[in-house]
Amino acid sequence: MAKTSAVNRNKMRERMASRDKAKRAALKAIVMDRSLPVEDRFEATLRLAQLPRNGAANRVRLRCELTGRPRANYRKFKLCRVALRDLASSGQIPGLVKASW
């Protein structure tokens, strides 16, 4: 199991990222729009820099829903390889069968 503080920190980052998503997208659109004056674009850059860093989507780490493990995760299942193997072996994931040829 991962430290609960790390899992809670990541969940807080997810909430902040979803909250700030529209605001960040609007400011980024202003910054990238070449037709606007440089002053407006620079002001949007400063406002973007004032937003909290944890509100950025790339700060969110994909973690296992069961164990909180940060590595070897399958996005489709939101599980790490260890938890996926345990659940698949016990038949708790519908449609997932062990390969044999």
UniProtKB/Swiss-Prot annotation:
MF GO annotations: rRNA binding; structural constituent of ribosome
Superkingdom, natural source: Bacteria
Species in which this protein is naturally found: Granulibacter bethesdensis (strain ATCC BAA-1260 / CGDNIH1)
Described function: Binds 16S rRNA, required for the assembly of 30S particles and may also be responsible for determining the conformation of the 16S rRNA at the A site.
GO process terms (BP): translation
Cellular compartments per GO CC: cytoplasm; small ribosomal subunit
Assembly mode: Part of the 30S ribosomal subunit. Contacts proteins S3 and S10.
Lineage: Bacteria, Pseudomonadati, Pseudomonadota, Alphaproteobacteria, Acetobacterales
Name of the protein: Small ribosomal subunit protein uS14
InterPro entries given in the database record: Ribosomal_uS14, Ribosomal_uS14_bac/plastid, Ribosomal_uS14_CS
Family (UniProt): Belongs to the universal ribosomal protein uS14 family.
Residue spans of biased composition, Basic and acidic residues class: 11-20
Gene3D superfamilies: 1.10.287.1480
A Pfam family recorded for this sequence: Ribosomal_S14
This protein's UniProt keywords: Ribonucleoprotein, Ribosomal protein, RNA-binding, rRNA-binding
